[in-house]
């Protein structure tokens, strides 16, 4: 079994990003900039945002974290996004999810300039992604695709099962796999006989937030398993949606948790921010 080491690959990508930033600063005399909006005091979100800011700093990307109270109104949040859209020094804008219940997440995501939408959640970018056109791709599925590429995993003609149909991972993951000419089945909580689907799969991508859902007897010998899930047990241990110990002697490729897909998400966010910085001139020249 080959371990898909997302931590090592993410460090490689971050080093590439740092070089790209240096080139942009030298050639265009601009510093790529990213704004992160954090609403409320959720500890997990705060930790994740801090990690994003640190990664930006290490890569030479200017970043600002805009903290807003849990009680903020939707109008106040939209006004903040509007200001960021107009700020030429900010190439990327992302809103840390989830948002409080008084906020309509769809309206907020649609308010972000599509050319600054480094999370790839704006309908403009989602549509372009589905149509296999150039777009900002959601960072986690983007990271998984980069992992396939790095390890020489062929997707064309392969049977791939995606377990989970979220807007953040499942749906975009399926779209990217379809564009890569894979035969894709998407399973959700209503799927009957999940095991029958996974046993027929060459590759399984799981992202549901249920510890150890995918077990050894659910995949065929030599299957590839990409575990996007991250769950904290009562013991404090972090585990994935797949039973790593049970699967490690049956799979040909397997991602660990932690250290698999997780580190790739921030690395690909940095890649998207660099992409956005290269669109700065295009944004400024719009009517």
UniProtKB/Swiss-Prot annotation:
> Which residue ranges traverse the bilayer?
none
Q: What reaction is this protein's catalytic activity?
A: (6R)-5,10-methylene-5,6,7,8-tetrahydrofolate + NADP(+) = (6R)-5,10-methenyltetrahydrofolate + NADPH; (6R)-5,10-methenyltetrahydrofolate + H2O = (6R)-10-formyltetrahydrofolate + H(+)
Reported EC number(s) for this entry are 1.5.1.5, 3.5.4.9
Its domain of life reads: Bacteria
Q: Which GO terms describe its cellular component?
A: cytosol
- Classification via InterPro entries: Aminoacid_DH-like_N_sf, NAD(P)-bd_dom_sf, THF_DH/CycHdrlase, THF_DH/CycHdrlase_cat_dom, THF_DH/CycHdrlase_CS, THF_DH/CycHdrlase_NAD-bd_dom
| First and last residue of the signal peptide | none
What does the record give under GO molecular function? methenyltetrahydrofolate cyclohydrolase activity; methylenetetrahydrofolate dehydrogenase (NADP+) activity
The Gene Ontology biological process terms listed for this entry are: L-histidine biosynthetic process; methionine biosynthetic process; purine nucleotide biosynthetic process; tetrahydrofolate interconversion
Q: Name one Pfam family in it.
A: THF_DHG_CYH_C
Q: Which PROSITE patterns match?
A: THF_DHG_CYH_1 (PS00766), THF_DHG_CYH_2 (PS00767)
This protein's UniProt keywords: Amino-acid biosynthesis, Histidine biosynthesis, Hydrolase, Methionine biosynthesis, Multifunctional enzyme, NADP, One-carbon metabolism, Oxidoreductase, Purine biosynthesis
Q: Does the keyword Oxidoreductase apply?
A: yes
Q: Which family does it belong to?
A: Belongs to the tetrahydrofolate dehydrogenase/cyclohydrolase family.
Question: What function does the entry list?
Answer: Catalyzes the oxidation of 5,10-methylenetetrahydrofolate to 5,10-methenyltetrahydrofolate and then the hydrolysis of 5,10-methenyltetrahydrofolate to 10-formyltetrahydrofolate.
Name the chain's protein. Answer: Bifunctional protein FolD
| Species whose genome carries this gene | Aliarcobacter butzleri (strain RM4018) (Arcobacter butzleri)
């Amino acid at each position: 079994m080959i371990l898909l080491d997302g931590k090592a690959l993410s460090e490689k990508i971050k080093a590439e990003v740092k070089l790209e930033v240096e080139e942009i600063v030298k050639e265009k005399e601009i510093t790529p900039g990213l704004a992160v909006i954090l609403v409320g005091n959720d500890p997990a979100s705060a930790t994740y945002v801090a990690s994003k800011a640190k990664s930006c700093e290490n890569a030479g990307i200017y970043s600002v974290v805009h903290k807003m109270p849990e009680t903020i109104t939707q109008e106040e949040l939209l006004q903040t996004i509007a200001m960021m859209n107009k700020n030429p020094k900010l190439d990327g804008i992302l809103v840390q999810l989830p948002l409080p219940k008084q906020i309509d997440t769809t309206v907020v995501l649609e308010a972000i300039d599509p050319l600054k939408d480094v999370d790839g959640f704006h309908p403009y970018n989602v549509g372009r992604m589905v149509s296999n056109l150039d777009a900002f791709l959601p960072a986690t599925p983007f990271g998984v695709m980069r992992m396939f590429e790095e390890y020489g995993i062929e997707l064309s003609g392969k049977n791939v099962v995606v377990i989970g149909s979220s807007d953040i991972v499942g749906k975009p993951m399926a779209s990217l796999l379809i564009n890569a000419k894979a035969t894709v089945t998407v399973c959700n909580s209503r799927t009957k006989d999940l095991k029958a689907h996974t046993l027929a799969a060459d590759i399984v991508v799981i992202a549901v937030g249920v510890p150890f859902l995918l077990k050894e007897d659910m995949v065929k010998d030599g299957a590839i398993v990409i575990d996007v899930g991250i769950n904290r047990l009562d013991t404090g241990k972090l585990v994935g949606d797949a039973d790593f110990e049970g699967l490690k002697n049956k799979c040909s490729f397997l991602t660990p948790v932690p250290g698999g897909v997780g580190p790739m998400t921030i690395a690909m966010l940095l890649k998207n921010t660099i992409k956005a910085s290269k669109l700065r001139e295009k944004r400024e020249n719009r009517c």
